[in-house]
Amino acid sequence: MKRIAIIGAGLAGLTCGKALQQAGHDVVIFEKSRGIGGRLATRRAEPFYFDHGVAAFTASDDDFQGFVNQLLAEGVVAVWAVDQATPDNPLVSTKPHSMPRVSGCYSEYYVGIPAMNAIGKHLARGLTVRRNTRVGAIIDHHPIFNSWELLNDKGETLGQFDWIISAMPVEQAKSFAQTSLHTKVLNKYALMPCSVLMLGFDTPLALDYEYAKIEGEDIDKIIVNSAKPHREGGYSLVIYSTPAWTNRHIEEDKTACINHLTRAASQVLGIDLSTAAHKDIHHWRYATGEAVNLQSGDHQLGYLLDSD
């Protein structure tokens, strides 16, 4: 039996921890936030609920489909048969109800129920997860003690372990790289940011679709979050910015960001969204990943990138 530390309690960290625990190992997961699940996140602002991280997901791999099927059987996720659309004009559409349906796109997605954060909570059952714990350093005690030691951001020890597994965004993992090989591999990947605007309305909007892929200059997609299965609460929209927009505005005033994206989305839909009863925004500095400069054989190095 090995004593194993996993840094990060997102989907990758939790599934890895579960598998290692089931194999008989002593696993401790460290999470810097108070919540778990990473981008499988949900925010509540009564009476509204917003899945403000991963909106939904698909399964195109047999192994992952098996994992999803188990979650379906356990009542943790449900199929979302999406009414999906794309605007006639990626910048302006005065008749949102006339948006044509997308051809060749997924029509079924999976979502956590009753919210996306239910997946992380389910996977964490039975695992030792130390929340609100930021790892500050990794100390190599090889070959004398044949172990690794974790320190928190105050320099206090978190324990010694046989293995340490990084399940954090690649940009954060770079600070813990132990060798030039680690750095070289991590530099092959980049993470792009995303801002998520959350709008809650007292009265439903006149939209005939639940998912609109915009791909405009500022807006990437618009989702009627309250239309997902098993959702409670008021009518809610979740609006995702493009990475380029977030790069330009992430350090700006929160209210200014909310107003900017609200105006941009209003222009796309042809509806005044400023009437929302609730408005909020969340910036993800590390939202989606892309591989850069990959070479043959890189997949054999044993690194896993979760880019949603």
Give the predicted meaning of each segment:
Residues 259, 266-301, 305:
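Flavin (FAD/FMN) cofactor-binding core of flavoprotein oxidoreductases
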Residues 19, 42-86:
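N-terminal FAD cofactor-binding segment of flavoenzymes
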Residues 19-45:
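Glycine-rich FAD pyrophosphate-binding loop
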